[in-house]
């Protein structure tokens, strides 16, 4: 059985950084599932499609090539907004499920980050983290990231985006963003990157010890 590390949480919570650091530590492959939805959104935007159209979004998801995750466009603010809109469609989530599930079953283990990994994609994951932070802190992080990418946007605009995405991600009927009952909450609001990673490492090490000795 693969040792799956599921890292869930809202946008700009620090989950991607935590996940990538954990993957490097354990030498596990990593999948950022948010990029899948961003890539689907970018496909639609490139074709002048509507991310709110469930049929067009599902077609885009089924035609997605994994290489498209490497496009710089998937890291933009527009891609993030489109991703949140296409992710509400059950057909899109179904189209991408097998790809994510197959990745989760890789031996000896893997790291997957997203919104529904511990609840839908890999509910059996031995290590589950729910990484979060206040909307204001997350908005400040994302704003600085976008400025570094050359995008022109205000902090207030980014905060509005964050709040809108939280509402959409948490309120969708299909696989809403929520903390799994057995996930450990990691609030990074007042943590540095190193502090967040160290806390995450301890959580995973505890899970690994329990996984290796289930009766312990």
Swiss-Prot record:
Keywords annotated in UniProt: ATP-binding, Cytoplasm, Kinase, Nucleotide-binding, Transferase
Gene Ontology terms, MF aspect: ATP binding; CMP kinase activity; dCMP kinase activity
Gene Ontology cellular component annotations, sorted alphabetically: cytoplasm
Residues annotated as binding ATP: 9-17
Zinc-finger listed as a keyword: no
Catalytic class of the enzyme: transferase
Chief localisation class: cytoplasm
Protein name in the entry: Cytidylate kinase
């Amino acid at each position: 059985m693969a040792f799956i590390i599921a890292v869930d949480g809202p946008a700009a919570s620090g989950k991607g950084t935590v996940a990538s650091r954990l993957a490097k530590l354990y030498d596990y492959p990593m999948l950022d599932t948010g990029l899948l939805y961003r890539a689907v959104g970018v496909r639609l935007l490139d074709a002048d499609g509507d991310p709110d159209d469930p049929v067009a979004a599902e077609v885009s998801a089924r035609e997605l090539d994994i290489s498209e995750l490497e496009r710089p466009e998937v890291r933009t603010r527009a891609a993030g907004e489109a991703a949140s809109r296409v992710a509400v469609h059950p057909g899109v989530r179904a189209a991408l499920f097998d790809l994510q599930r197959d990745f989760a079953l890789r031996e000896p283990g893997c790291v997957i980050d997203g919104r529904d990994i511990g609840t839908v994609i890999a509910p059996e994951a031995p290590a589950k983290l729910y990484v979060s932070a206040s909307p204001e802190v997350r908005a400040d992080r994302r704003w600085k990231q976008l400025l570094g990418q050359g995008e022109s946007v205000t902090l207030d605009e980014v905060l509005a985006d964050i709040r809108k995405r939280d509402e959409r991600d948490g309120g969708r009927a299909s696989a809403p963003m929520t903390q799994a009952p057995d996930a450990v909450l990691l609030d990074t609001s007042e943590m540095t990157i190193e502090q967040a990673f160290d806390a995450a490492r301890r959580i995973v090490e505890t899970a690994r010890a329990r996984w290796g000795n289930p009766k312990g």
